Amino acid sequence: MANSAKAEEYEKMSLEQAKASVNSETESSFNINENTTASGTGLSEKTSVCRQVDIARKRKEFEDDLVKESSSCGKDTPSKKRKLDPEIVPEEKDCGDAEGNSKKRKRETEDVPKDKSSTGDGTQNKRKIALEDVPEKQKNLEEGHSSTVAAHYNELQEVGLEKRSQSRIFYLRNFNNWMKSVLIGEFLEKVRQKKKRDITVLDLGCGKGGDLLKWKKGRINKLVCTDIADVSVKQCQQRYEDMKNRRDSEYIFSAEFITADSSKELLIDKFRDPQMCFDICSCQFVCHYSFESYEQADMMLRNACERLSPGGYFIGTTPNSFELIRRLEASETESFGNEIYTVKFQKKGDYPLFGCKYDFNLEGVVDVPEFLVYFPLLNEMAKKYNMKLVYKKTFLEFYEEKIKNNENKMLLKRMQALEPYPANESSKLVSEKVDDYEHAAKYMKNSQVRLPLGTLSKSEWEATSIYLVFAFEKQQ
């Protein structure tokens, strides 16, 4: 409890220092005390020229206390955190042969994380930023990073349901998709309680339209889809047209589609109706691309929040910078991961608030540069657009909270977001590594449970547990 209280106070201090960074003309950075172990969580910022000495000293004392306690506080590693629910399992009839399973797998929508927004030179509210911590070569790569991200997603090939169902990360992608579905559904309901009709949504970084069905099920009236990748936007539009033209299709929202870099271009200049307001802006697995610079992050936030109606929400999913750096510092090299995902930084120990680049690779899905999103900084920057943070949870926390709801639990089954364990005699587990299911085997041995269990492999959980969900509300 003492460690938890200190961590909470520590987070508040991080927020104050992020605020100092936004208001000053000095680019700051955050780091982990060099004595931090794998289980430690002691993140800090380098003292900036505008920071008071006593705050920095107090923060250092915090770090020392957190590091000392981290080794004995029993903090779970990603592999130990995996929660098993014996009730969250597919029906027995769904555990037939592998080919049968592939044909039966009907998912709500394409569930590849849509990391489509990108980077560029923001022009709004520019400020001077000291770039001593950023190599000279990196300063000149803004356009290159933007082009790299757009090219990557433009070149991704569409694959059928059959092939996707055979993917090593089939359940991981379904699990991430379930997380988005629950988040979107919950905040659509909040909007509907305030506004009975005519709900308008901005999908910032829409990709190929993986969330279109979610918006349809949410009974919205208008959707604006925008993405940096032109090919992805065209595929998204085609998917929408296919949904609209189905004979048995119910009423579907109206939509417009925009190819633009949301960290470089002002979206209202491209809307059919520049005065249009939104009830929700959804930014799923995207906003980290904009944190190459302050200007880019600010432009992304302006696009996301400026046209939100009072009481509207900016919701999303993004990597948890604290978790990324914790794993990095626990690694013996500048990278970490497993056979599913890898994260590679340029160096340890120095993490600027903007432009802290790392390369992220997820098997067959993502292989592009990303940037750390220091969440206290995002929170502070959002205040400029009259936004208040109303919800933030790690994927683990979000799962544990939402799985208690029976509707969410049933949706988890329908979307096949957890893998049946043990596998049926006619099928096999997605991972061939025995230790990937040690947690499930142990749980099954020590508990009276109904089989099969529903779980993710250890490798998949390590990949998905680097993320968090968030929601900001537009104030009056």
Curated annotation (Swiss-Prot):
Q: What is its main location?
A: nucleus
Q: Where in the cell is it found?
A: Nucleus
Site feature: mRNA cap binding: K208, K214, R239, H288, E370, Y467
Which PROSITE patterns would you find in this protein's record?
A: RNA_CAP0_MT (PS51562)
Q: What, per the annotation, is the impact of changing W178C?
A: Loss of methyltransferase activity in presence or absence of RAMAC. Complete restored RAMAC-mediated methyltransferase activity under reducing conditions. Loss of methyltransferase activity in presence or absence of RAMAC
Q: Say if the entry is tagged with keyword S-adenosyl-L-methionine.
A: yes
* Record's compositionally biased regions (Polar residues): 20-50
- Pfam families from the entry? mRNA_G-N7_MeTrfase
Query: How is the activity of this protein regulated?
Result: Methyltransferase activity is activated by RAMAC.
Residues recorded as binding mRNA, renumbered to this chain, are N176, N177
CDD domains the record matches: AdoMet_MTases (cd02440)
Q: Give GO cellular component annotations, separated by semicolons.
A: fibrillar center; mRNA cap methyltransferase RNMT:RAMAC complex; mRNA capping enzyme complex; nucleoplasm; nucleus; receptor complex
Q: Extract the ranges annotated as region (Disordered).
A: 1-146
Q: What is the effect of changing F398C?
A: Loss of methyltransferase activity in presence or absence of RAMAC. Partially restored RAMAC-mediated methyltransferase activity under reducing conditions
Per the database record, which ranges form the mRNA cap 0 methyltransferase domain? 167-475
Q: Where is the composition biased (Basic and acidic residues)?
A: 1-14, 54-68, 84-118, 129-145
Name the catalysed reactions.
a 5'-end (5'-triphosphoguanosine)-ribonucleoside in mRNA + S-adenosyl-L-methionine = a 5'-end (N(7)-methyl 5'-triphosphoguanosine)-ribonucleoside in mRNA + S-adenosyl-L-homocysteine
Q: Name one GO biological process term.
A: 7-methylguanosine mRNA capping
Alphabetically ordered keywords of this record: Methyltransferase, mRNA capping, mRNA processing, Nucleus, Phosphoprotein, RNA-binding, S-adenosyl-L-methionine, Transferase
Quaternary context: Interacts with importin alpha, leading to stimulate both RNA-binding and methyltransferase activity. Interaction with importin alpha and beta is required for its nuclear localization, importin beta dissociating in response to RanGTP, allowing RNMT-importin alpha to bind RNA substrates. Interacts with elongating form of polymerase II and RNGTT. Interacts with RAMAC, this interaction significantly enhances RNA-binding and cap methyltransferase activity.
What's this protein's name? Answer: mRNA cap guanine-N(7) methyltransferase
Biological source species: Homo sapiens (Human)
Q: What is the lineage of its organism?
A: Eukaryota, Metazoa, Chordata, Craniata, Vertebrata
